[in-house]
Regions:
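N-terminal cap/lid segment of alpha/beta-hydrolase-fold proteins
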Residues: 1-15
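A general secondary-structure boundary signal
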Residues: 6-8, 20-25, 94
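Alpha-helix initiation/capping motif
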Residues: 7, 40-43, 78, 82
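Conserved beta-strand scaffold positions in the cores of enzyme catalytic domains, especially
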Residues: 8, 60-62, 106
Length: 106
């Protein structure tokens, strides 16, 4: 297995899937992809080759972005924007009470 079992958290009313493993400084991984893409290749599992290796030194979290993978779609169409995606990402960090996380994206 290259990832842990998925977890889900409510982020401002949007059910959000993520993976969480390891101990240490938080390292949050955000995948690439287009807003609202139905392609499951654009999800947190993009990080599967790096995830467990990184968890040896960090608490590593990989999250499905807003409207991608198994994270729900935005609550309104006006959130299908980059700012809506960033708001959701920040909401994810707040919901998990992550202070000063390291962030990686592609």
């Amino acid at each position: 297995m290259l990832m842990t079992e998925p977890k889900y958290i409510d982020v401002d009313g949007v059910l959000t899937r993520y993976f969480d493993a390891g101990k240490g400084p938080p390292l949050v991984l955000f995948h690439g992809g287009n807003l609202g893409s139905g392609n499951l290749a654009e999800c947190a599992v993009d990080w599967e080759l790096n995830f467990l290796g990184l968890s040896k030194n960090f608490r590593v979290l990989a999250v499905d972005k807003l409207g991608q993978g198994y994270t729900e779609n935005p609550l309104s169409d006006d959130k299908y924007t980059m700012s809506g995606t960033v708001e959701h990402a920040y909401g994810f960090l707040r919901a998990l009470k992550l202070e000063r996380p390291n962030i990686v994206g592609h």
